[in-house]
Structures are given as structure tokens and as C-alpha cells.
Design a protein with these regions (language model features):
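Short helix-capping/linker turns of helical repeat alpha-solenoids
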Residues: 102, 114, 133-136, 149-151, ...
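Hydrophobic face of amphipathic alpha-helices that form TPR/SEL1-like repeat modules
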Residues: 106, 110-114, 130, 142-149, ...
Length: 817
């Protein structure tokens, strides 16, 4: 006689009946009835002969006297009611006895057989009987797993938790470990790390390797590193690769155990041999950096490759780096981009940043600014500072995205707040120039300072300039020089040039021509045109360098060819006067023109002089006037005087005394002595201005005190005749002498008159004759006539007269002949 098992599944109603593994068709109306009514035939149109009858009608190979065993999955009270009904409705004492005789091991074995046969639902029901009716911990654990995975029953993490707890409370190590995971991963219950640690540690104490690893991990999360090491060690000794890896991390960092990089590398190796990708990657890092092992880039590459092929995102990133830089493998931009892309597509920010770099520069992929910006953005949104900085750059200049300076500021700030020095500098620039944000030099200085303190050379130089010029902070040359020097020492050419200026003029440092020239030379050798020009000046003037005009010209030429307007002007001067080169007026005019066209006001004036006097270019007063006017509009005093003179005389422009006076005044206000003299003349004569002798005398005095001979002569006239000043012959004589000493023939003649007649000086005809002669030698007709007059009237003794007459006659002949 064979045994046929009847399985009944009940929740709040009859769910199913399986007879010998075959499902029974049960009308819905029957399923909802009380237990006792299952055994009664249905009334009306429902086809149901009662559970007993339906069981017997199922075909099992013609067996007439089969014995039935019953398995009821459901609440205990319903089970009892069901078994009473089985007995009452005469399914057989033998069947009932068979059911009662089954042991928990029978259920467990049958459940496992059903599992192997793929009959998950039957396996679950058998595990449930053993778990519920017999309280068997293994069965409780299996029931929990079925609920957790939805195997043979509807998935329910809450029910899984209930059964894991039942088994765990009976000290089942696997259940304790699983229960710890439920609390750790918040499966069917709120996350509770403390409760998770309690159950993991209970299982760990029984030797469960997974629980030992997880106990160590939870202690590590609390920074209880000694306890973490203890449990990692226990799990590692059982060859748990995860624990070996984590223990290696502890040894490498010295967390909870003495630092031992060699031990760390060995633990990584053990885990790596087992194929643990995280350890393979970390072992690669050890070989890359020589941490605990001899540096070996080829070995590092192999470790990265193994981990990368398993999908380890860090290893894929590292493998991309190896291919990018040729680390342990032949440099291959295509492979670099490919592996970076694999990691990037998994969301690894550093790889996304690198992939953006590859697209930006066209390395290993076709250049694509839009894709570059896209990958930068993906990394930036994960908080990757370098990507935030580069995304800011993209928005700042409109590369791969539409230009948007406010977005640039947004991303620069994100990166800057994470300490990215480049972004801090750029944010400072945005504040300094009002780019994408309101201009704020004080805020600019703050960000420059942050970047400068991290060694960013551009920021160091920018900060130095702020202190140098007093932008956003008080002028402080000492602080300026300190920051400028830091940037200069890192090779920043602009900083080297400005440091040269500091040493040249003593800004923040002691003046030192040799140091100045040294820094100019460093910058000049990097192609800095300002420094090349300044170095040329050092050689021209012999300051900090031996005087060498040819060397000066060499550096002027380098700077001039680089477009430096000051150097172009100086080179023009060298060619004009033959200083360090052979005189060449055509080349002089050429370089003056280039400098003038670059906006150099001195060169504009010099180029005007070329046109005025036909130096190296055809004489053209109208063109001269154009360039004088251009220079004058730029505020160059000498050009203002020249254009004033042109308007005064009508050279190249229509004569206009008012315009002349206007330009004389502009130049005079800047202290130009010639302009002061001529403006004085305008006031004396009332040309272009209202006649004003007092103002005229004031201007003559300003010019005269600067040594202008014509003004000294004119001021002498003012004092001689009392024009605009009190008449003072002695003062007139003083100013005539100053002009006469500079070779002014009219002043020399006047001084002769004063000595001959004793005006403002003691009469002295010998002195008078000497000054007349000086004036006459320059062709002064009045002086010649005065000499003739004095010779006719006699002078001194006969000997003296003869000597004087002889000398005068000889001189006269030379001048008149």
C-alpha cells in the first residue's frame, strides 16, 4: 500500500490543496467556506462532492487502498479543526496515523527533495510544518529565506524577519547572521546598526565567517578600529577575501593595528588570488606606488586589468589612467578612453572627469566639446571638484555649452568651496572683473588668498598685484613682493617681470639692480616682452648688467618683434641715433610707426618728428600734425606742445591761435617748460588768450626755473621793463645771465648792454665786450653793432686797447668773412 500526501494551505481562507503533488481544482465558493463545510457536498450548481470524495476521485494509477497523510499549513487552531474533520469524515485511521507518525526530519528531508526537484511551493509548506509545528531552527531559517526571496511563497521581508528571529533566538548562526543583515540593510524592519551588530556578533562568536567580517565592518564604521581588526582577522584566517581586503586596509593605514604596508600588500594579494576585485585593484595601487612592495608598473597594470574585467569601477578607471600615461603598458589613448568610458558609465566621477578631458582634447576619441561638457557635468553633479572647475570654465568661455558667466560662477564656487585652487583663482577673477557676478575686489582678494596659499601661481601673482596696486586691500609693497616672489619662483613670467620692477624701484624690497636684472632675464627668456624691454634698458644704462648697447638692442628687438610698444619706440630711437646699431633713419621711422600704431604716445610724437623733419620718411607736416595730435590726445606733454606750436605757426594745419594756446596750456599744466614759455608769450601778446602780463611773467618764471633759456631771457625783459612784475634791473641781469650761460645770443647781448651801462650790475666794459663777442659769434647783429660802437669810443690802456681791438678784428673777420 502506497502513501499519498495531501497538502492543504490555509491563510484566512482555503488557498490550495495538493494531492500527491497534483493541485486540486476547488470552486471559489468552497474556498470561502468554514473548514467543516469543505468536507460536505456543495448545494446547487457548484460541483463539489466534499473534500474526502474529491481526494479519492483523483487518479493515482488505479490505487484503491492508498493511505493518505495530511500536511496542513495554517494557523494551529485551524489545523486542529481540520484534523478532527479528517477523522470524522472517515478518511481512515491509517491515514491519520501515518500523518501523526511523521517526524521533523521527515519534513526537512522531503522539503529538501522538493527543493532539488524544483517544487518550491511544496518545499516551503514542508519547511513551514517543521518550523511552526516543531520549532526546528533550520526549518525556521529556510522558511525565512523563502519569504525573503519569494521562493514557493509570496515575498515578504517582514515575514522573513519573523522567522529569522525565531531561528536566531535558538542560536542558529546562519539565522543570526541573516537577522543582522536585515537590521543592517533595513529589510522588513527599520535600519538599526546596534541591533545588527548584536546579531552579527552572536553569529561571529559561533565562527560564522560572514558574520565575523560584518562585525568587523560595523565596528570600523564606529571607528572602533581595534575591535574591527580583531573580527577581520578571524574572518581573514578563514580565507574570507572581503575580510582579508579590509584587514589590509587597516594595516596600510595603521588603523587599530600597527602600520605595516608589507602586511597590507600580502593581505591584498591573498584576497586578489581568490578573485576579489577590490583587492586586485588595491594591490595594483600598491605596485603603482611602491607601497609594501617594490614599485612595478607592469604588475600594477595586470592587477588593474583583472579587477577591471570583473567590472570593478575603480580598476577600470585606473586601467584607463595606465593607458593614458603609459604606466606599465604602451600608451594607448583609445584604450584609455574606452576604459574610462566603462567606469564613467557606471557613474564613477573621476572617470567621467577624465572622459570629459579626452573629449575636450580629442585624445583617444574624436574631439567633441559638447560631450566633454556633458561628462564634466555628470562628474560635477556628484561633487567632483575638478569637474566642477572645468564645467565652470566651459560656461565661462562657452565651450561645449552656451556661454553663461553666472553658471560659470556657480560651478567655480562649488569647486572653490571644496578647496580646488584653480577654481578659487577663477572665482577671484570673476569677482575682480565683475564677470557673472557683481564686481567686488575685496571678495576677489579673499579667493586669490585661498588659492595662493595652496601654491597656485596665477593666484599668487594676482594677490601680489592687488597688494601692489591697492585693489581690494590697502597697498602693501612688502606683502606684494612676497607673493609676487612666490609666483616668480614657480616660473610665472609675469611675476618674474614685476619682481624685477620691485627690485628696480625698491617696492617692498631693498633696491637691487642685480636682482632686478636677474628676474627680468628669467622672464625675458620665457618670452615676456615687458621683461625683454626692461632687460634691454638694464644693458643700455648699465644697471644690474654691464653696459652693452648692442645687447640692449638685441633685447629691444626681441620685445619689439613680440609687439611691445615701448621696446619698438626704444628700438626706433637706437636706429635714429645709432646707439648699439648702425644709424638707419628708415628703420627708426619703421619702428616708431609700429609703436605708434600700437598706441604708444611717445612713439606717436617721435613718428610725428620723423614727418616734421623728414627723418627716414618723406617730410610731411600734415602727417606730422596727425601724429602729434594723436599723441597729444593721449596726454603726452611733448606732443601737446608740438601740436600747439603747429597751430601757432600754421604748420600742417590751419593757423589757430586759440587751439595753440589750448594745447600749450595742457602741456604747461604737465610741467613742459617749452609750453610754459610759449604760453607765457601768448599771454604777453594776447594771442589766443586775453593779454595778461602778470600771467605771462608767471609762466616765464615756471619755465625759466626749469632751465629754459628763452623763458629766462623773456623773464629778464619782464624785470627790465616791469612787464607783469616789479621793474628790477638786478633781477633782470640775473635771468639774462642764466640764459646767456646757456648760449642764448639775445641774452648775451642784453648782458653786454647791462655791463656796458651798469644796469643792475657794476659797470664793466670788459665784461660787456666779452658778452657782445659771444653774441656776435652767433650772428647777433645788435651785438656786432655794439662792438663797433665800443671800438670807436676806446677801451682801457693803449696796450689793452690794442689787444682788444686785435682780438675783435680777428674774431669779426672770422664771423663776417
Amino acid at each position: 500500500m502506497s502513501e499519498i500526501q495531501v497538502e492543504v494551505c490555509f491563510t484566512d481562507k482555503l488557498e490550495s490543496v495538493r494531492v500527491g503533488g497534483k493541485p486540486m481544482e476547488i470552486p471559489k465558493a468552497v474556498k470561502a467556506k468554514p473548514v467543516e463545510e469543505w468536507f460536505e457536498p456543495a448545494a446547487g450548481r457548484v460541483k463539489w462532492g466534499g473534500l474526502g470524495a474529491e481526494i479519492k476521485e483523483m487518479d493515482f494509477g488505479g490505487e484503491k487502498d492508498a493511505a493518505y497523510s495530511f500536511l496542513f499549513n495554517g494557523p494551529e487552531d485551524k489545523k486542529q479543526e481540520f484534523m478532527e474533520c479528517v477523522e470524522r469524515f472517515c478518511l481512515g485511521e491509517e491515514a491519520q496515523q501515518e500523518t501523526k507518525k511523521k517526524t521533523v526530519q521527515d519534513y526537512l528531508q522531503e522539503a529538501k527533495k522538493n527543493q532539488q526537484a524544483g517544487n518550491a511551493e511544496m518545499a516551503f509548506q514542508q519547511y513551514m510544518v517543521a518550523a511552526r509545528d516543531y520549532g526546528h531552527p533550520e526549518a525556521q531559517f529556510e522558511v525565512a529565506r523563502c519569504y525573503q526571496n519569494g521562493t514557493g511563497v509570496e515575498k515578504s521581508e517582514e515575514n522573513a524577519l519573523v522567522w529569522y528571529k525565531k531561528a536566531a533566538e535558538q542560536c542558529d548562526a546562519e539565522a543570526q547572521c541573516a537577522l543582522g543583515e536585515c537590521y543592517y540593510q533595513a529589510r522588513g524592519v527599520e535600519k538599526d546598526d546596534k541591533e545588527a551588530r548584536r546579531w552579527y556578533e552572536a553569529a561571529a562568536t559561533q565562527g560564522n565567517v560572514t558574520a565575523q567580517y560584518m562585525t568587523g565592518r560595523l565596528y570600523a564604521e564606529l571607528s572602533y578600529n581595534v575591535a574591527a581588526v580583531k573580527w577581520y582577522t578571524k574572518a581573514a584566517e578563514q580565507e574570507c577575501p572581503e575580510a582579508q581586503y579590509e584587514l589590509g586596509v587597516c594595516y596600510e593605514a595603521g588603523d587599530g593595528v600597527g602600520k605595516d604596508e608589507a602586511k597590507a600588500a600580502e593581505l591584498y594579494r591573498k584576497a586578489a588570488v581568490q578573485g576579489y576585485a577590490e583587492a586586485q585593484n588595491e594591490l595594483g595601487a600598491c605596485y603603482s606606488n611602491g607601497t609594501g612592495v617594490a614599485k612595478d608598473l607592469e604588475q600594477a597594470f595586470e592587477c588593474y586589468r583583472k579587477a577591471a574585467k570583473q567590472g570593478n569601477v575603480k580598476a577600470q578607471y585606473n586601467l584607463g589612467v595606465c593607458y593614458a600615461i603609459g604606466g606599465g603598458v604602451t600608451k594607448d589613448p583609445v584604450q584609455a578612453a574606452e576604459w574610462s568610458a566603462r567606469a564613467a558609465e557606471q557613474g564613477f566621477a573621476a572617470a567621467q572627469y577624465n572622459l570629459g578631458y579626452f573629449y575636450r582634447n580629442g585624445e583617444g576619441v574624436e574631439k567633441d566639446p559638447k560631450k566633454a561638457a556633458m561628462w564634466y557635468e555628470k562628474a560635477a553633479e556628484q561633487g567632483f571638484a575638478e569637474a566642477q572647475y572645468m564645467l565652470g570654465y566651459c560656461y565661462n568661455i562657452g565651450v561645449g555649452v552656451e556661454k553663461d558667466t553666472s553658471k560659470a560662477v556657480f560651478w567655480y564656487r562649488k569647486a572653490a568651496e571644496q578647496g580646488n585652487a584653480g577654481a578659487q583663482y577663477e572665482l577671484g577673477e570673476c569677482y575682480y572683473y565683475g564677470n557673472g557676478i557683481d564686481e567686488n575686489e575685496t571678495e576677489a582678494v579673499k579667493w586669490y588668498q585661498k588659492a595662493a596659499e595652496q601654491g597656485d601661481t596665477d593666484a599668487q601673482f594676482a594677490l601680489g598685484k592687488c597688494y601692489y596696486y591697492g585693489n581690494g586691500t590697502e597697498v602693501n609693497y612688502e606683502t606684494a613682493a612676497r607673493w609676487i616672489q612666490k609666483a616668480a619662483e614657480q616660473g610665472n613670467a609675469d611675476a618674474q617681470n614685476l619682481l624685477g620692477d620691485c627690485y628696480c624701484y625698491g617696492y617692498g624690497v631693498e633696491p637691487n639692480n642685480e636682482e632686478s636684472a636677474k628676474w627680468y632675464e628669467k622672464a625675458a627668456n620665457q618670452g615676456n616682452t615687458k621683461a625683454q624691454y626692461s632687460l634691454g634698458r638694464c644693458y643700455r644704462n648699465g644697471t644690474g648688467k654691464r653696459k652693452d648697447l648692442a645687447e640692449a638692442v638685441k633685447w629691444y628687438e626681441k620685445a619689439a618683434e613680440g609687439g611691445n610698444a615701448d621696446a619698438q619706440n626704444s628700438l626706433g630711437y637706437c636706429y635714429e641715433v645709432g646707439e648699439g646699431v648702425t644709424e638707419d633713419l628708415a628703420k627708426a621711422a619703421k619702428w616708431y610707426r609700429e609703436s605708434a600704431e600700437n598706441g604708444n604716445e611717445v612713439a606717436q610724437c617721435n613718428f610725428g618728428l620723423c614727418y616734421e623733419y623728414g627723418k627716414g620718411i618723406k617730410k610731411d607736416l600734415a602727417e606730422a600734425a596727425v601724429w602729434y595730435d594723436e599723441s597729444a590726445e593721449h596726454g603726452y606733454a611733448r606732443a601737446q606742445f608740438k601740436i600747439g606750436l603747429f597751430y601757432d605757426k600754421g604748420y600742417g594745419v590751419a593757423q589757430n591761435k586759440e587751439e595753440a594756446a589750448k594745447w600749450y596750456r595742457k602741456a604747461a599744466d604737465q610741467g613742459d617748460a617749452d609750453a610754459q614759455c610759449n604760453l607765457g608769450y601768448c599771454y604777453k601778446k594776447g594771442e589766443g588768450v586775453t593779454k595778461d602780463p602778470v600771467r605771462a611773467a608767471e609762466l616765464y618764471r615756471k619755465s625759466a626755473e626749469q632751465g629754459n633759456a628763452t623763458a629766462q631771457y623773456n623773464l629778464g625783459i619782464c624785470y627790465e621793463y616791469g612787464n607783469g612784475v616789479t621793474l628790477l634791473k638786478a633781477t633782470a641781469a640775473e635771468w639774462y645771465r642764466k640764459a646767456a650761460d646757456q648760449g642764448d645770443s639775445d641774452a648775451q647781448y642784453k648782458l653786454g648792454v647791462f655791463y656796458e651801462n651798469g644796469y643792475g650790475v657794476t659797470q664793466d666794459k670788459e665784461q660787456a665786450m666779452q658778452w657782445y663777442k659771444k653774441a656776435a659769434e652767433q650772428g647777433n647783429e645788435s651785438a656786432k653793432n655794439a662792438i663797433d660802437g665800443m671800438q670807436g669810443g676806446g677801451l682801457g690802456t693803449a696796450v689793452a686797447a690794442g689787444a682788444a681791438l686785435g682780438g675783435a678784428a680777428l674774431l669779426w673777420k672770422i664771423l663776417r668773412g
